[in-house]
Regions:
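Conserved active-site alpha-helix within GNAT-family acetyltransferase domains
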Residues: 96, 117-134, 140-144
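Conserved N-terminal entry element of GNAT/NAT acetyltransferase domains
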Residues: 1-13, 154
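Conserved GNAT acetyl-CoA-binding A-motif
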Residues: 105-117
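Active-site acidic-Proline motif in GNAT/NAT acetyltransferases
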Residues: 86-88, 92, 116-117
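Acetyl-CoA-dependent GNAT
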Residues: 9-88, 99-101, 105
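Terminal substrate-recognition subdomain of acyl/acetyltransferases
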Residues: 147-154
Length: 154
């Protein structure tokens, strides 16, 4: 069932729900990794990114008002650090709404890193016009990643 989403700027009150959502999303995507153990890292990482100028935008499920997902984008560099959508909202438009917000904040282009073994995410970004620019390795997990980039149409 499709939902409608409202994208709002991050507020500190969102943080506990966003951390829960991030853990649940990644636990579903890569169950072999203990993302609950990475929760403290996420909280510190978000604070660090915000201190460096990045912004978090939150997709709220319009009927319920609960966070359905979030995106962290640095409008100065165009680097998208996090995109997470609760599994209950996969395929309902939350990720697209969040990416539209990111593209609005970084209209010159966006770069991101995605795990090569996350075909759902790779296909999603390709559907939005992202292309693979290079290969690398995630410094935390050691997993192979793609650097993907989006540029607006000329």
């Amino acid at each position: 069932m499709a939902s409608s989403f409202i994208v709002v700027p991050f507020a500190p009150a969102h943080l506990p729900a966003l951390a829960d959502l991030w853990v649940a999303t990644w636990a579903r995507t890569m169950p072999e990794i203990d993302f609950e153990a990475r929760r403290p890292w996420l909280l510190e990482h978000i604070a660090k990114l915000h201190g460096q100028g990045a912004e978090t935008h939150v997709a709220l499920d319009a009927p319920a008002g609960a966070p359905a997902g979030f995106v962290i984008i640095d409008p100065n560099t165009g680097y998208l650090d996090q995109l997470a959508v609760a599994p209950a909202h996969w395929g309902q438009g939350a990720a697209e709404a969040l990416m539209a917000a990111a593209q609005h904040r970084a209209p010159a282009g966006i770069a991101l890193d995605v795990n090569q073994d996350n075909p759902r995410a790779v296909a999603f970004y390709q559907k939005l016009g992202f292309t693979i620019a290079s290969a690398g390795q995630n410094p935390m997990s050691g997993r192979a990643i793609w650097r993907m980039e989006w540029r607006p149409a000329a």
